[in-house]
Amino acid sequence: MENKKNFYIDGKWVAPKSKQEIKVINPATEENCAVISLGNKEDIDYAVSSAKKAYSTWAFSPKEERIRLLEKLYENYKKRWADIAAAITTEMGAPKDFATKLQAGTGAAHLKSFIRYLKNFEFEKPLGEHAPNQRLIYEPKGVCALITPWNWPMNQVCLKVAPALASGCTMILKPSELAPLSSMILAELIDETKFPAGVFNLVNGDGETTGNALTSHPDVNMISFTGSTRAGALISQNAAKDFKRVSLELGGKGANIIFKDADPDAIERGALRCFRNSGQSCNAPTRMLVEKSMYNEAVERLKKYTEN
């Protein structure tokens, strides 16, 4: 069982202030695969303080410097692709081929996309032909709290971390305590890439203690959260106290709705989409509503398909 108790704060791996720990379970084997620490308010205070300090210089870093570092991060990511995929297989039970091609692959794709977008983005430009002397200026928001789910670890992490780095924000990442291992590899890559200390920080933990301390911290300017509707509501309450900007992606699990005149393969296709990613995707159609007249047929076809 791996020891993954340390956090990445202020450009180094540090021992947590918290003494609370949790075991990470491989859902495919139901065996313990690692132990992590659950951060407390002191750990969050340290991480936010480091991010706030780094923001004073990172926010004004040249676009060319951010591009250089992101391109280096992308190259380092590709070198550890297999390690990232293996970590995802371990922490969430994803099949190896799926973890390699899609789970780790989407993380790399997001990095590449935001690098391309940053190269073409203008942080300052004329407001328009009607106001040639007025400027439209885009500024980084500040210290960001990034909280990600367990079902698409690198997809969600890179989708939040990459644009934050590109825009000049600093951040504290709290990955899901159920699937933190791939995120810790990303922290290693950011360290290897030599981003300035404090720009990126990682604190593992749960929602009740760690997440609450992070989203209610007065020096956090923005929160990006993907997860449950209940947690999103609590985060919104914390954010409202000092008007933090909030980006929420909540809920999921929509139903298949299939009528008698639907595509003949709709039932089998719905089952395939249900089981993809071990059934853990937010858009996995894990409920199937069918026209009453074809209920028995649908049950038999699903049974035959899933037994194959």
Can you say where each PLM-predicted feature lies in the sequence?
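N-terminal Rossmann-like NAD(P)+-binding subdomain of aldehyde/semialdehyde dehydrogenases
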Residues: 1-132
